[in-house]
Amino acid sequence: MRGGVNMASIKDVAQKAGVGVGTVSRVLNNSGYVSDETREKIEEAMKNLQYTPNELARNLYRKKSGIIAVLVPTVEIPFFAELVHNIEAELYNEGFKIMLGNTDKAHNAELEYLDMLNRHIVDGVITGVHSLDVEEYKKIKKPIVAFDRYLGENIPVVAVDHKEGGRLAAEILLKNGCKKIVHFRGSTAVESPYHERHFEFARIMKEQGVECFDYELAWNKFDLEYYKYAVKDLFDRLDEWEFDGIFGTDLVAIECMNEVIRRHKKVPKDVKCVAYDGTYITQIVEPSVTSIVQPIKELAQEAARLICELVNGKTYKNEKVTLGVSVRKGRTTMK
């Protein structure tokens, strides 16, 4: 007895079940043959003794930690917060815990998590960050799933149909009579599926003869203060350009709405607005924001499925899972 708690050992279990320690070990690690009768005796002994297996020792034996690292720039962004929440729930159902890495404020954090993968501290990595050179990922032949980024032919990618998302956003603004549109686009410094929505949006606007001002956001910047700076910077540049439509990710779109109001104009009377991602924040602001919605729960399910399959030995080549997007109407595009 230690501190009033019965600290039973594997030897105690073996003695109570009338078997050798090696037999108990095979049951714990699910390795080698053990008859059903003997297995039942061991499980009953464990129950009676309230024996809890040493998870660390068992993982060392199996060379598995039961942990998946999930890397995002920051959970301060609602999209990443919802994604992590859903990935954690999916992996928990598969017997895994997550190790969360917010990488935007930590130099070399992404590389350090990959080193942990190499050293078996984590079993796999799901990454949605854009800070590390692709060549670093190509060196690693371990379970990795990429979210919205191309990292190499052996690393599966999970994304949405961004081209369709760009088309839907363009159609909404055009149907609402917008003639001069501000388009916030992600950085072109990394190769990512999300570029497809910007290309399609810009293509349609050009095809329709609509003026469109593209503002490229800085690489690897995912915080509200930067978005506030970027929006004010753009509005100052376009002070004399009477734009009437805005397209950007949720936080950018909402900050644009705030800036429109600060400049004594109204949404949607003077400026229409469409957001991309469709997280909960687009529904709790006033007016509610018309959004192109990414199916975050389904994206998380696919990422979790792929990483579990990779951990269990499956391999992929040039695998890309693409999910559809949808439109959720808000009051920012009402006529």
Q: How would you describe each model-predicted region?
A:
Residues 236-247, 251-335:
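Flexible loop/turn connectors
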Residues 89-134:
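Central regulatory/effector-binding core of bacterial HTH transcription factors
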Residues 128-168, 188, 277-289:
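Flexible loop/hinge segments that line or gate small-molecule binding clefts
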